[in-house]
């Protein structure tokens, strides 16, 4: 090695004495005032060893330690909390405004009540003819009035075999007799003038008397419907009530019977009372027809018999 080469090496050693190294990038950044970035780079700079000629001759190399913790990432939310709060508030307002739109229902129509026209402005219908139905319960005569009768037992309390007499005048209790029917009191018969299908009913009401104290009387009491002429296909037109010794504990014993009968014009109907009681002397005096809950007999027209139909 010549003398010139030795002089050059001595000059290099004189500028970089032993134990020193070239200033790192971290030192330069620290001198310029970027402290945070200098600290970051200082963690990643491999330490130099001035004793080694290679370290003194070449600049330091940044090497990341795999086991060292990475610096925390920059959190955008932490830097802008007010912006995120404003966005959340706007979303809540939008949701509150949309809820009524999707939950809106159609209003229910108002209830409409149809009332009858004012009587003062009613039209004159005197010249119009209203048709009368021929099927109903009860039905009507040609004049439009219902054919109906209800007769109440008259002047009869004791139980004996007889034909009952009836109240037929309006106002006598609940008795009623319409057109198309008439009652002949002397014969005790109800006469049918309007032919057709009739609903006929009987109601028998009995009460114990004050002499019925022995609890021994028993038997039966009947109401028998009698028709002139006889009604076809009906053999049993009777209402029967059975009485027992214990029956006197009831203040009222009542039974009813009904039947649809086809009656012709001129048919005559009457009701017979039949009784059979035994078990004590004068047993027939222990029971009587009730009053004011009165035994009744009646009928009404269901369907008229019109030959031209």
UniProtKB/Swiss-Prot annotation:
Residues 104-309 are extracellular. One of its GO terms (cellular component) is plasma membrane. SMART domains: TNF. Glycans are attached at residues 139, 161, 293. The chain crosses the membrane at residues 83-103. The keyword Thylakoid does not apply. GO terms for biological process: immune response; myeloid dendritic cell differentiation; positive regulation of activated T cell proliferation; positive regulation of cytotoxic T cell differentiation; positive regulation of interleukin-12 production; positive regulation of interleukin-6 production; positive regulation of type II interferon production; regulation of immature T cell proliferation in thymus. Residues 147-302 form the THD domain. Keywords: Cytokine, Glycoprotein, Membrane, Signal-anchor, Transmembrane, Transmembrane helix. Belongs to the tumor necrosis factor family. Homotrimer. This is Tumor necrosis factor ligand superfamily member 9. It comes from Mus musculus. The lineage of its organism: Eukaryota, Metazoa, Chordata, Craniata, Vertebrata.
């Amino acid at each position: 090695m010549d003398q010139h080469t030795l002089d050059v090496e001595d000059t290099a050693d004189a500028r970089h004495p032993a134990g020193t190294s070239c200033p790192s990038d971290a030192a330069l950044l620290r001198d310029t005032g970027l402290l945070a970035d200098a600290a970051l780079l200082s963690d990643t700079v491999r330490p130099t060893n001035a004793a080694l000629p290679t370290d003194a001759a070449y600049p330091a190399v940044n090497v990341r330690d795999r086991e060292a913790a990475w610096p925390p990432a920059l959190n955008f939310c932490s830097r802008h909390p007010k912006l995120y709060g404003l966005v959340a508030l706007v979303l809540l307002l939008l949701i509150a405004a949309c809820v009524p739109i999707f939950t809106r229902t159609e209003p229910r129509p108002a209830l409409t009540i149809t009332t009858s026209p004012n009587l003062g402005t009613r039209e004159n219908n005197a010249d119009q003819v209203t048709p009368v139905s021929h099927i109903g319960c009860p039905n009507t005569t040609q004049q439009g009035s219902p054919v109906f009768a209800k007769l109440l037992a008259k002047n009869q309390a004791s139980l004996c075999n007889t034909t009952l007499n009836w109240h037929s005048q309006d106002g006598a209790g609940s008795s009623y007799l319409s057109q198309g029917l008439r009652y002949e009191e002397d014969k005790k018969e109800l006469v049918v003038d309007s032919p057709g299908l009739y609903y006929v009913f009987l109601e028998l009401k009995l009460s114990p008397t004050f002499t019925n104290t022995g609890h021994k009387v028993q038997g039966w009491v009947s109401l028998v419907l009698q028709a002139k002429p006889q009604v076809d296909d009906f053999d049993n037109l009777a209402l029967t009530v059975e009485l027992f010794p214990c029956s006197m504990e009831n203040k009222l014993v009542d039974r009813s019977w009904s039947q649809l009968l086809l009656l012709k014009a001129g048919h005559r109907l009457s009701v017979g009372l039949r009784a059979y009681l035994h078990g004590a002397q004068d047993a027939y005096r222990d029971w009587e027809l009730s009053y004011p809950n009165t035994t009744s007999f009646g009928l009404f027209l269901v369907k008229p018999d019109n030959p031209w139909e």
